[in-house]
Structures are given as C-alpha cells and as structure tokens.
Curated annotation (Swiss-Prot):
Mg(2+) 2 binds at E282, N284. Residues 121-315 form the ATP-grasp domain. It comes from Rickettsia africae (strain ESF-5). Belongs to the D-alanine--D-alanine ligase family. Mg(2+) 1 binds at E268, E282. Cell wall formation. The gene is ddl. PANTHER family: D-ALANINE--D-ALANINE LIGASE, D-ALANINE--D-ALANINE LIGASE B. Its cofactor is Mg(2+); Mn(2+). It is found in: Cytoplasm. This is D-alanine--D-alanine ligase. It is an enzyme of class 6 (ligase). GO terms for cellular component: cytoplasm. It catalyses: 2 D-alanine + ATP = D-alanyl-D-alanine + ADP + phosphate + H(+). SUPFAM superfamilies: Glutathione synthetase ATP-binding domain-like (SSF56059), PreATP-grasp domain (SSF52440).
Length: 321
C-alpha cells in the first residue's frame, strides 16, 4: 500500500473546544483522504483563531456518520478545513447544501471541478487560460513506452498536495510499463515546463499577492517540499517586473471567477524561463492553513494577519440553494 491513501472511517470524532461564543462553528478536519495529516495541522491554527474571535467551536474529525453528527451538533456554520477526498472534492459542500448549513470555501461544483484535473483543464482551456500540453492515460491502455517526450509529469486525477506526482526526466531510470497507477486507473501526463513556480492567493475574488517558490533540495515542488521546513524558500512578493506581476494577479482573479470560487483559493503557475510565458497549473479551492502554507503568508504580506484571515473566510460562509 502506498503511503498516502484514502481510507474509510465509520465514526466521526467530536470534541468541544469552546462552549460559549457568538456563533457555533463546526471545524471539519482530518477525514478519510490521503491529505488527512495536512488538514489536522491546518486545523490547529484555525481553531485557535476561531476561539480568539469569540466563536463557540466544535472540532469534528469527519467519519462516514457525519450527517447524523451534524444533526446532533446543529452548528451555525461549518468551517471546511478538510483537504482532498470528501472535503475538497465537493462531497461535503453537497451534503451541507442539502442540510442547509452555511459553510466556508467553495461550493460543490466549483470544488469538484477544481479537484478533478481533467475537468478543470477543460474548464481552463474553454476560458482561454494557457496550460501545458497534456494527455490522459488509462491503465487499460497498457502503454509500454513513454506516453510523451521527456521530460513529462505524471499526475493522479484527484489528489492534492502533489501526492502521487512524479516528474520523469531524460536521465531517469524509469519504465512506464512498470507504473502501477497507485491513485486510480487514469492519470494526466503533462509536458514539463522548466521555469519559475509562482503562487497567488485569492480571497473573496481579490488577488492578495503572489510569491515565488525556490526549491532547495528536491527536483520539484512535491509533498515533502511543501510541508518540510528548509526544503524551499518563499520569495514574497514574487520578484517580477510590475507588468508581469499584475498580469499574474489578473489571471488568478479570472480563474477564480470562471470557476465560481468562494472564500480563499490559491492559483498556481509556471513562468517559462525562456519566453516569460505563463502556464496555469491549477486552482486550489481549499488551500492549506499550516505554518508553511502560502495563502496565510501572502495574506500577511497584504496586511491581513491569520486571525483576520479566518474572520474574512467566515464572513463568506453560505450554502447553495
């Protein structure tokens, strides 16, 4: 079994963190996805901020009985701190729409579209957003040779935090015939663009700023690099010419709007070294809130501290009727 996998959990774990407050917030964390640990780390700072803001807070580590538990708890708002399957992919927003409980972050369709790399790519290209060349490969295709000229990137369709992402360079001892499709029967094979990794934080439709990621150890921005201190430097704001920086913000707001996102999001790009051409990678509708996460860092640069960021996210809580 691979290290990061979705697993089924029958019962939710519920803890009261604060029993008094102006509104009752259910902080939804953990869950059953491969990104469970990231969600738990994100929830630590979020829970402290919610209590500091004067909310009544109930911590819920989500299991399959979540609908019953929500009926028992009766929160005013759900703060969706889940990452990955069941939380970020539209499942939880869909349930909360049915239950008519306001929730933070993007809605069901926006979350589902952004989480699925095939459908988000179709949506991006339909709206004239530039992306690298890619193809879909099915396990049943039984491809024995490289499906694309090296270097290329292998991406699972529905994983976040770069889980399962592999970059295959010309010199690598890699045989595609041996690839075991650990995260589903389809993958995206994407042209590798050599360039600068840029990330933009968007909050309630407004781009707050951009930063550049400088890799210090690994060859690409993988799970280990994202969540291990000392594996990457964040240059905030991104050291770009003013016109290019502004273009990056405008493009991010365009993606956010066309995907009908809500609350916080993080748009990811590669700036090709030779041509200065921007390539969109994805938009993350449930960005991390860990000490190493990008959205809180950019928000701080824009003058919004972590507690105020959480308050702004809460203000946009709603359900889709």
């Amino acid at each position: 079994m691979h290290k990061y996998q979705t697993h089924w959990v029958e019962h939710s774990i519920v803890k009261i963190l604060s029993s008094t407050g102006k509104k009752h917030i259910a902080l939804m964390v953990g869950g059953m996805s491969a990104e469970r640990e990231v969600s738990l780390v994100s929830s630590e700072g979020v829970s402290k901020a919610l209590i500091e803001l004067g909310y009544r807070v109930t911590f819920i580590d989500m299991g399959a009985d979540i609908a019953v538990r929500l009926q028992e708890i009766k929160p005013d708002i759900v703060f969706n701190c889940l990452h990955g399957t069941y939380g970020e992919d539209g499942c939880l927003p869909g349930l909360l729409n049915i239950m008519r409980i306001p929730y933070t972050h993007s809605g069901m369709l926006s979350s589902a579209l952004a989480f699925d790399k095939i459908h988000s790519r179709i949506w991006f290209l339909t709206n004239n957003i530039n992306m690298a060349e890619s193809i879909v490969v099915n396990k049943s295709d039984n491809i024995k040779n490289d499906p694309m000229k090296r270097p290329y990137v292998i991406k699972p369709l529905t994983q976040g935090s770069s889980i399962g992402v592999e970059v295959i360079f010309a010199e690598d001892d890699f045989n595609f015939a041996d690839y075991d499709f650990p995260y589903g029967d389809q993958v995206i094979i994407e042209q590798y663009i050599k360039g600068r990794e840029l990330q933009v934080a968007v909050l309630n439709g407004k781009a707050l700023g951009a930063l550049e990621i400088k890799l210090l150890k690994n060859r690409f921005y993988d799970y280990e690099t994202k969540y291990t201190e000392g594996f990457a430097d964040h240059l905030c704001p991104a050291p770009l010419p003013a016109n290019l920086y502004e273009k990056l913000l405008i493009e991010s707001e365009k993606i956010y709007k066309t995907m009908n996102c809500k609350g916080p999001a993080r748009a990811e790009f590669i700036l090709e070294e030779q041509t200065n051409k921007l390539y969109a990678l994805e938009i993350n509708t449930h960005p991390g809130m860990t000490p190493l996460s990008i959205v809180p860092e950019i928000a701080a640069y824009a003058g919004i501290n972590f507690t105020n960021l959480i308050e702004e996210i809460i203000k946009m809580a709603s359900f889709e009727s």
